[in-house]
UniProtKB/Swiss-Prot annotation:
Recorded coiled-coil stretches: none
Cellular compartment(s): Secreted
Record's protein name: U12-myrmicitoxin-Mri1a
A GO molecular-function descriptor: toxin activity
Keyword annotations from UniProtKB, A to Z: Amidation, Secreted, Signal, Toxin
One GO CC term, this protein: extracellular region
Main subcellular location: secreted
Tissues in which the UniProt entry reports expression: Expressed by the venom gland.
The keyword Signal belongs to this UniProt entry's keyword annotation: yes
Length: 37
């Protein structure tokens, strides 16, 4: 389970990093879905 959790966290961070680099505004719904999970 810990491995899956690490992959999920890594994916979340990567997504946020790409979003920031792309300069696109972060969708509140996306943040809510990430926090919800």
């Amino acid at each position: 389970m810990k491995t899956i959790e690490l992959i999920t966290i890594f994916a979340m961070i990567t997504t946020l990093m790409v979003t920031v680099v792309a300069g696109d505004p972060i969708d509140p719904k996306v943040l809510e879905s990430l926090v919800g999970k």
